[in-house]
């Protein structure tokens, strides 16, 4: 049996939502396209096994792009996209001992790098004493495919 819960997000498109999917005793959280995470949403996404979570931009890198100012402002506001630091902070507040993998998603091609997103998350988890050898961190490729192998499919 599978259960899917929709969680409200903050984006400049109507009715933007994330998902909490539970099946086979495991929980996956999928959140992209949001400028911030409300506290009631944080409560719903605590201690998932897997997170696919937006880490859209590095603020300094974004500001150095050739994008128009209004686009940059749209991206960094509360109904835009999560920057690396905010994403890492939220993740450090919600992951738990059952968390096995974090996939960083929606990484901007112009305003971020996979290495930058990964480094910020790794540093934040380390600073809070949350980095573990059994916790996988994976910054997703823009057009790649990443397989999350659940506990029943682990090789």
PLM segments and residue spans:
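Core dinuclear metal-dependent hydrolase active-site scaffold
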Residues: 1-50, 148-155
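Cap/insert and terminal regions of metallo-dependent hydrolase folds
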Residues: 39-138
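Cofactor-binding loop segments of dinucleotide-utilizing enzymes, especially the Rossmann-like FAD-
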Residues: 33, 107, 142
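Residues at the C-termini of beta-strands that transition into short coil/loop
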Residues: 8-10, 54, 141-143
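Residue-level detector of flexible, active-site-proximal loop/helix-junction positions
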Residues: 11-13, 59, 144
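Short, basic/aromatic-enriched C-terminal tail that caps enzymatic domains
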Residues: 135-155
């Amino acid at each position: 049996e599978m259960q899917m819960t929709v969680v409200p997000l903050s984006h400049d498109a109507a009715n933007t939502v994330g998902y909490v999917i539970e099946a086979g005793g495991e929980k996956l959280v999928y959140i992209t396209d949001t400028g911030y995470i409300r506290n009631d949403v944080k409560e719903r996404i605590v201690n998932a096994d897997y997170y696919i979570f937006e880490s859209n931009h590095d603020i300094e890198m974004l500001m150095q792009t050739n994008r128009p100012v209004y686009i940059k402002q749209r991206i960094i506001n509360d109904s835009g996209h999560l920057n690396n630091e905010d994403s890492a902070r939220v993740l450090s507040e919600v992951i738990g001992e059952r968390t096995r993998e974090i996939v960083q998603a929606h990484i901007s091609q112009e305003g971020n790098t996979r290495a930058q997103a990964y480094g910020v998350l790794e540093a934040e988890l380390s600073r809070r004493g949350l980095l573990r050898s059994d916790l996988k961190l994976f910054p997703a490729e823009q057009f790649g495919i990443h397989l999350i192998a659940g506990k029943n499919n682990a090789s």
